[in-house]
C-alpha cells in the first residue's frame, strides 16, 4: 500500500504507477497541514481516473474518520451535488490556528454554522454573520466549533466522492510548497524602483514548475544614464 499527498496527482503518473505496481494499493491523500495533512482519501484505480470530469487529476475521495467536510458557497450555504463550491474542513484533526498570526487565524478558521446540529448535514446552513456568532457564542471557540476555510474549489459527485477543481485564489503549489503569489508581488512592489509587478508559475517542457516575475520600473523624468551616454 502506498499513500501519495502534498499536491494534486497527475493522471498520467497515476496510470504509470498502476501499470508498474499492479499489486500495490495506491491511495490519493488530500488535506492541508491545518487539518493534520490527510482529510480525505481515495483509492486510485483505472476506473477512478475516468470518474472525474475535471482536469487531469483523480478525485480526492471521501473524508476519513472523525472528519467533517462541507462544500459551501460564499455565504456558508451548502451547494447542491455537482455544483462547485469551497471546501471547508472540521473534526478532530483541526489545528488551533496559526502561531502568532491572529489575523490569519481569524480569516481561515471560521465559526462552524453546523455546530450543534447533525454531523455532516448538508441541508442546513446559516447565512449571516450575526447568526453564526450566536451559534458559537461570544467567547473563544473550541476546535469543534470551527471550520477551516481551505480556499480549494471542489464539487461533490452523486456517489459522495469529492473532486478537486483548483484554487479560488492565487495560491499555487510548487514542489509541494504552498506559495501566495500576492505576497511575492507585494515584496517586489516594496522596492522603490518597481512600479508594477506580477508573478506567475511557469512550467517547462519536462513539467518542472518555477516562478517567474515580471516588473515595470519607475522611470524618472529626464534621461537615464544610458540615454545620457548615447546622447553624448
Give the location of each predicted region.
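AMP-dependent adenylate-forming
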Residues: 19, 25-28, 43-120, 134-232
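Acidic/polar hotspots within intrinsically disordered regions
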Residues: 126-128, 135
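Conserved helix-loop-beta element of the AMP-binding
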Residues: 1-12, 20-29
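Glycine-/small-residue-rich active-site loops that bind phosphorylated ligands and cofactors
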Residues: 9, 33, 205
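SF2 helicase/translocase ATPase core recognition
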Residues: 30-37
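Specific aromatic-rich, kink-prone transmembrane helix
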Residues: 40
